[in-house]
Amino acid sequence: MDLLCAGELNVDLVLSGFQSAPLLGMEIMGEDYTECLGSSTAICACVASSLGAATGFFGKLGRDHYGEIALQGLKKYNVDTTLVEISPKYRTGLTVSVSTADDRALVTCFGDTIDAFRQDEVPLERAN
């Protein structure tokens, strides 16, 4: 393994297709949404893998809908996920992005996985 990335894993729920973000107390209609792998560490792993580096990820996911999306997002880019712990005791984190053509607003809930992450568990010997 050329690169072992370790960190939080979460999913982005991106809402789009409107001119401006709603104000508090207001509801607007969007045109589209997408659920995709988020977290800067995971995105770094995917980019490194797509550039040809043998890349793995160490992290934790809930055995839930968002955990499955995150896991499939890593696998889509051939990131080794054998060091990703998946457990029903965790709740996968989520970022909701309200995105317009000019800007975005983000709300992130880390879930339980970031608190369960321990640096001393990272198997550094697995990276070259």
Please give the residue ranges for each predicted region.
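Conserved N-terminal subdomain of the carbohydrate kinase-like
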Residues: 26-27, 50-128
